[in-house]
Amino acid sequence: MTVSSAPYCLAGQVALVTGSGRGIGAAIAVELGRLGASVVVNYANSSAAAEKVVAEIQSLGSAAIAIQADVREVSQTVRLMDEAVAHFGGLDIVCSNAGVVSFGHLGEVTEEEFDRVFSLNTRGQFFVAREAYRHLNEGGRIILMSSNTAHDFSVPKHSLYSGSKGAIDSFVRVFAKDCGDKKITVNAVAPGGTVTDMFHAVSHHYIPNGEKYTAEERQQMAAHASPLMRNGFPLDIARVVCFLASKEGEWVNGKSLTVDGGAA
C-alpha cells in the first residue's frame, strides 16, 4: 500500500509507540510508517527487535528511530519524549502500548505482582499520557491500550490485569477533557485475544482445560469466539489505532474502542 492509496494519510506527522519492538506495538509502528508518519520505536530491553522494526519502517520510505526507555520509570518517559522531539522537531501522535499480562487467583496474588502489573499497565500509561500532553503539538493524538477484559469479557484469575486496564477506560474520559485546550484527542483501544507471542504464552488460561490442548489447537478454538470465525491479529489493532491517529478520527474522543471481532 502506497501513501497515496492509503485510507489515512499521516505524512508529515511524527508518532511514538511505546513497547513497539514486537507484537501489537510493532504492527502499530509499522502501519503508522506505512501511512507516512515518522516513527519513534520505543523498547525497554531488546534493541535488536526494535531495530528490525525501524528497518521495516524505513523500507516503506518513512523515517524511524529506536529509543530505549522503561516507561515504568517516569524519568525515562520524560527522556523518551524529550529525545523524540529533539530528533524529529516535534511530536503529533503517542500510542501507549507497553504492558504486561498476569494471571492469579484473588487469594494468591502478591503485593509484588500487583505492583509489577499496575506500575506498567496503569501508572506507566498515566505518565506516558501526561508527557504526551506536555510534548505533543496542538491537534495531537494520545492513544492508550486497554483490553476487552476491562469491561466486556470476564476471565477467571484475571482480575489484576483486568483492573489495571479498566483504569485506562476511566483515564481517557477525563484526559480528553484535560487535553481539549491543545485540541488533543485521547482514546483507548481495547483488544481481545490477538495472535502474538504473548497470546501463545497465555492462551491456555482463556480456554477451559486449555493446558490439554496444543498451541495450534488453542488458537483454532479462540477463533470461534468471534462470529467472524477467525483470530485477531496485530494488524487488526494497528488499523484502528491509525484511524484514531488520523484527521478522520478527530471526532472520536474520550472513548475506549473494543477491537475483538465481536468476541465479547
UniProtKB/Swiss-Prot annotation:
Keywords: NADP, Oxidoreductase. Secalonic acids show unprecedented anticancer activities against various human cancer cells and might be interesting for further derivatization, targeting diseases such as cancer. CDD domains: THN_reductase-like_SDR_c. It comes from the Eukaryota. Its EC number is 1.3.1.-. Gene3D superfamilies: NAD(P)-binding Rossmann-like Domain. The keyword Oxidoreductase applies. NADP(+) binds at residues 24, 70, 97, 130, 161, 165, 196. InterPro entries: NAD(P)-bd_dom_sf, Sc_DH/Rdtase_CS, SDR_fam. The keyword Aminoacyl-tRNA synthetase does not apply. It is an enzyme of class 1 (oxidoreductase). GO terms for molecular function: oxidoreductase activity. GO terms for biological process: secondary metabolite biosynthetic process. The active site is at 146 (proton donor), 147 (proton donor), 161 (proton donor), 165 (lowers pka of active site tyr). It catalyses: 3,8,9,10-tetrahydroxy-6-methyl-1,4-dihydroanthracen-1-one + NADPH + H(+) = (3R)-3,8,9,10-tetrahydroxy-6-methyl-1,2,3,4-tetrahydroanthracen-1-one + NADP(+). Belongs to the short-chain dehydrogenases/reductases (SDR) family. Atrochrysone carboxylic acid synthase; part of the gene cluster that mediates the biosynthesis of the tetrahydroxanthone dimer secalonic acid D. The pathway begins with the synthesis of atrochrysone thioester by the polyketide synthase AacuL. The atrochrysone carboxyl ACP thioesterase AacuM then breaks the thioester bond and releases the atrochrysone carboxylic acid from AacuL. Atrochrysone carboxylic acid is decarboxylated by the decarboxylase AacuI, and oxidized by the anthrone oxygenase AacuG to yield emodin. This is Short chain dehydrogenase/reductase AacuN. The lineage of its organism: Eukaryota, Fungi, Dikarya, Ascomycota, Pezizomycotina.
